[in-house]
Amino acid sequence: MTASVKEGAHSEVLDKRRVNTKLGQKITANSLSSDANSSMNSKRLGLGIARRPGDNLLASISDNYGGKYEVSGENMTELPQPRGLFIHRNDRPISDDSIVTKNSELFSSGFSDDNNSGASSVETDELSSEGGINLGLNNLTVGPIASDEHNMDGSFISDNFEESFISTDSVSTLHIPNENRNHDKSFSYENGPQSRAHKMISTNTTSSTINANNMKSTGTLPPFRPRSNSYSSKHLGTSTLYDHSNSTSAILPNKQHYLTPSQRYRMRKERNDTSLRNSIRKKERFYDEQEPNMELQEGDIDDSLIWNIPMASFSTNSFLMSSGDPKHVRSHQSKPQPRFPQRHNFGSVPHFQPPLMSSALDFKAMPTSPVPGIDSTSDLQFIRETTENLSSVYLQSSNRLSRSKLLERTDSAEVLPIEFKEASEKGMEDLILVSEDKLDVVSHSRPSWLPPKDPEEKKLHENQISKSMSIASFEQLDRNKESEERHIQDETNRQKYVLLLDRGVTRNSSIQSLKKMIWETPLTVDTRWSIYDQLLQSDVRLISEQYIESFEQIMQVLNKMEFPRNKETEIEKLIDNSIKNKISGKQNISNDLLLMLQLKSISHQGLIPGDELLFHHFLTDPSTNQSLQHVWELVNLIQLTCFNDFTKEKYDIKIVEPRGVVSKYLSQDDSFKSEFNTSCLNSTTWWNILERVDHNLFMWIMDIIVVANSQCFKNYPINREKFKNKSWEYYKSKKVIVEYKVLASFALNVLLNYHFGFNDLISITTLEDKSFCIPMPLDNLFDEGYINNVFIRKWLHYYKKF
């Protein structure tokens, strides 16, 4: 016995210097054996002698107590080999201990370093006063605490056990309710190298015991609950752990034992695996809760398909354990259960362990996702059929959505803005691809096939466009209002023309009214011929009878003679240059134009500038009723009175007069220096302007010129006898007005406001553009009446300056 004590002391010294000490301790107590058996069992207890972790006393115990307290295999299962103790980390490594083994972090985990070294000491604890019931076992074996996650059959341990296992610094105290509150002995195990005290409290040996046979027959496990920082094993029995006080076994609780490297390795591995699995499951539950089902929110899936959701069916629980007891079905809301840290012993009372075939996971829960390096099973293996069904539903809904969108785009293509349709006709846009989002981005001020504008730029441009459109709208409203007023005014003036003609246009009051109204409204077709005739020669018509050759006579002369071919060619060329190649050529040219020019060429006055234009416009104007005689008389009358030699001469002088009105305006712009001369500004080039004037404006211009050359024949009548046998020069000096101002103001208006597309009044006749017109028509913006009215008002403005 003394040798054993010395040997144990020597072993204690060696344990402090050894890096990893092999733990092999087994305390066997049998209340039914004799003192000799107790002494023999005491000798079999480890006294600090190094032992292999694989040595198991199960065989020897089975030989001694085989079959005496057998445990039913239906409810109990054998625990695996011990892997490690619940230990505390030393603040400092023990001398000659392995620092690398304890701190090398072989398995990266938040729990890999916790309690990787330490020792377990067996101490007695007084727990009888705490309400805990000590259970006296026939045979009590204290050894390395198993921390394996799996049972021997490979089934999973519940999370409740894992959670209890993670808290390694505290081992729960087991409380077993029983009718008998008396205790023999209680043992308390506290981890840590500083814990070396062992206390043993002897209790009444006659206390009531738990019959092992009763435990065997019932096969049920008493309930238990965890406690922190200590683990107490309370047993009910009639015999103590040590039958002899002088036994060397009494000093065993004072012995300090450490975990071996393999035990620490297994413990760290189990902690890493447990932590990793818990983390994976928590993340899976989190993402399953956070992931929304957008397709169901769209309402595109029928209610009959709602059942087809990706979840595990009953066929996917092959990897789970069948639950024989519904009480042990795993639930996240259930109360955590501790892992019972006791190795199975056939000779002891059954320890508290989940029964065989108990389920650690809920078979209704989703299967865990595969973990790289741990599980090689694919998660798609369990939901393959479900994913195929969902894929078909998604494809079907996608096709249905595509068809509906295509039909919607096709219908909306008919009501798209005009710019998209124009771009589609040019091949620059596909109407089916135009969505509502594109309509919001595309700007009307930029083609749709170009990159869209910046939002701020688009907003700025739209504001400017809106402002311009507003101004244009107001202007258009003003023009519309003005057009209505002008239309009313024209109707009123036309009625006044008729009244004035009935009353007599040669009266002074009538002439003043005419000179005012003619700038507002042109003469009507019905009144033009009569007013021209009365204003230029009064009712006496002395000029037509005495100074204009009769149309019948000149016609007879032309019929009797053979008109020279070269003269005829010159007349045709004149028609082409002055009429056909100009804006007037757009109208129908009368077949009698050549005849009228031939007659004029053989007359006493001959062809003079402007004859071709006057004949052409009067032949096409309904006011003359296409009467050749009326046209003949009217053209000659205008040439003799309005464009006589005195008027032309006066115009040629005043148009280039250095101190005149025209010079005053043109001298303000240096660009008119090359144009302000007699070669460019004369009575002949004046007619070049009229070649570029359309018919309606030409007739209005003639109306103004005729009214400007009118006389008050009512107060100063023409005496036929006075001018009988008098020459035209005499009559002209007495009864013809020289009115050059209206002609000069007309030319000044064109030079200042309509000098576009030509260099001077000479080159204007040589322009090849047949459609060139003064003023230029703007059919898309303004009507012809408005443009002509603006031209006349500007002309009136300059006419008043003379």
From Swiss-Prot:
- Name its GO BP terms in alphabetical order: fungal-type cell wall organization; protein transport
Q: Which residues cross the membrane?
A: none
Q: Which UniProt keywords apply?
A: Cell wall biogenesis/degradation, Cytoplasm, Golgi apparatus, Protein transport, Transport
Chief location category: cytoplasm
Residue ranges of region Disordered?
207-230, 323-345
- Asked if the keyword Cell wall biogenesis/degradation belongs to this entry, the reply reads yes
Q: Name one Pfam family in it.
A: SBE2_N
Localization of this protein:
Cytoplasm; Golgi apparatus
An annotated GO cellular component:
Golgi apparatus
Entry's family note: Belongs to the SBE2 family.
Q: What does this protein do?
A: With SBE2, is involved in cell wall integrity and polarity processes like bud growth.
Q: This chain belongs to which protein, by name?
A: Protein SBE22
User: What is the scientific name of the source organism?
Assistant: Vanderwaltozyma polyspora (strain ATCC 22028 / DSM 70294 / BCRC 21397 / CBS 2163 / NBRC 10782 / NRRL Y-8283 / UCD 57-17)
Instruction: List the taxonomic lineage.
Output: Eukaryota, Fungi, Dikarya, Ascomycota, Saccharomycotina
